[in-house]
Amino acid sequence: MKLSVIIPTYNCASFIEKAINSIVKNRPNDLEIEVLIIDDGSIDNTNKVIKKIQDQINNLTLQYFYKSNGNWGSVINYVRNNKLAKGEWVTVLDSDDIFSKKTISIFQKYAQKQRYDAIIFDYYKCWKKFLWKIPTYARFRKEIKGELKKQTPFCIPLAKFFKNEVFYQLPKLRENVGFQDAIYTMHALQIANNVFHVSKAGGYYFFKRVGNSMSIPWHSSRFDIEVQICKDLIENNAQEIALVHLLRLKFRNLVDDKKIKFTVKRDFCFSGFSWYSRLILSLMYNFWLKRYFNSSE
């Protein structure tokens, strides 16, 4: 079995070695891994860092590709258009995140069962010295079926593994805009038929690092992009994820200022979320967020 790990990077020379080491140091001996570094137009010394790592490792394939800047969605499009991911399984690891020590071994165990086309872990959300374990799904839910139940509010790509055929069925992502990772995960989960949930933290998500998309100020272009993402999520029957975007106060205030409302086609359904996510989102929707949505019915 072979695993393709896509690492999108942009000016992350100071972080990317840790990301790669979280693969190199934890690779099972009987698992073939190819790492695809897609440099989205970095102007730092990322290329030199990668060359140094390539000279040092010999237990996996590490390939480096440089392209003009087009943002996160363009990286996924680049891999798909050039058919670079050759593994039976594909995952995306952002260059400022890392896998947990046992993630790849646990993934391999379930992938070998040949029953699933998506294997989804929980993850740690990291800020300074604080860690929060984020449950992608309810803790005791293992095999996830049903379009609405497969969706998750925690839709970063970290520690989410998809079969090759799922990856290559993805529609083209938007380029030259940010925050396409949620759209990537949404589509992949919709395409996957048999999703398995591993209720262990598969990686560490450093969401407030300098350069991370979540640390970008709320200027007008970011706001416009976020509004479009919410519309895309709703259009693709993932309106619950759009609602999660409205939990952010700054975004909500701007939506109020612009008097924007989102039109949905059905009632909200939080059945696939962890119990406290269901509780919080249900309360937030009924008491604060309902006013941001119109029904098309």
UniProtKB/Swiss-Prot annotation:
Q: EC number(s) on record?
A: 2.4.-.-
Q: Which domain of life is it from?
A: Bacteria
**Keyword field:** Glycosyltransferase, Transferase
Which InterPro entries does the entry link to?
Answer: Glyco_trans_2-like, Nucleotide-diphossugar_trans
Please give the positions of the paired cysteines in each disulfide bond: none
Record GO biological process: biosynthetic process
Gene Ontology molecular-function annotations: glycosyltransferase activity; hexosyltransferase activity
Keyword presence, Ribosomal protein = no
Task: Say which species the protein is native to.
Answer: Mycoplasma genitalium (strain ATCC 33530 / DSM 19775 / NCTC 10195 / G37)
Does this UniProt record's set of keywords contain RNA-binding? no
Identification of the protein by name: Uncharacterized glycosyltransferase MG060
Family in the record: Belongs to the glycosyltransferase 2 family.
